[in-house]
Amino acid sequence: MDLITSAADLKPSTPWSDTIWAYTSEESLVDHETKARLCVATLLPFKDKKPDWDGFTKSVRWMQQCADHYGVEMVFVLNADTGYIFDLSNELYAEVLRRFRADFPTQRFITGITARGAENDSEFKSERYHPLIDIAQEHDNCELMIMTSRLLNILEPEARRDAYFEIGDYVTHPAIAHALEPSFVSWATPYEPWLLHQIAQHPKYVGGKVSTLDEPHFLYWSAMCKDLRLPFAPHSGDDYGIASAIKLGLPLLIGAGVSACPLICAARDMWLLDSVADKKFKTGSGRFDTRVYKLFEAFQSFEDLVFRLDDRLSASPYKHSTAHVLHQLGIIDAPEPHPDCKDLRGADEALRMQEAMRRPKRIAPRLGIPFFGA
């Protein structure tokens, strides 16, 4: 079978398996020269059933320290994943953005945009995204991540494209499209190659985030965007495959960017060749620091436990694990989730996270990585 190599040959029904991009190796896409940004799904901690705003600010400053030390561009993702997005009212959503902007007036952020009030709808309505878009667009220097929703996701490719375009035409800020596999929610379907190509050509969509457990869609996206030179940045949402995005010189947009922040920032820098101007800590050999491979192992083994699947085969409780990690690092006062959050770990989570952190805590001082405890 001749594989598709041109966007002109794509049809709405074309599966990835019919394209050359589904068979492109990670090795052929390796990039040792680009220090892409790290987008961290910032935790809104709670204390005594109320938002811990001091802990929120303290955790952001800690991550800024990590980024500054290694010269990594960091963007904070608010109201998604570790922000307990599905439990925030519009009022608390707006307050998170206001407080962040007041404390960090020049810091870029991405904010998750979900459909509101669609629970009883029988068909997709783009205006359901407008309330949070309006709140977000009160702020400058931010991007909008258009989170997938059931009624958006179940549309056929052409109707789904039209829906994304309706949303894109409403926004005034740069937007990021968000895709999931059914391994995360049962109704989710990743973008077909035709749909990805269509979204990538809309001027408001500067990139997309894809999260998968079973099929390497981030690799497909990366191969297509590089081959076709699309003005669209694939962002990896794969907390189970963090090293891949670093190796490809592409952005990460992950909850693991919080708990493993100094480790990931260090890896970003170590992967670069000495000849790259942005490299902060050069090897003196002209090459990259091959010790990064052991760092990859250390932070992935750690995050595999943070993101371990529960009895429902869901990784959603990782946000509770993240709170335990930040608490053990002395950054927040309590490992407490949002009071309405149902995705919780067990009573032994503090011990489990202590065990999970042993290897990264061992390797961090050996590689001179600061900000990760003793």
Predicted features by range, described:
Residues L3-P190, K342, G368-F371:
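Active-site beta->alpha loop and helix N-cap motifs at the rims of alpha/beta catalytic domains
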Residues G168-A315:
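Catalytic alpha/beta core domains of metabolic enzymes, predominantly
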Residues F109-D121, M145-A159, L180-Y191, S211-S222, ...:
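Hydrophobic transmembrane alpha-helix bundles
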Residues L3-L29, T34, C39-P45, C66, ...:
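C-terminal alpha-helical cap/extension of soluble enzyme domains
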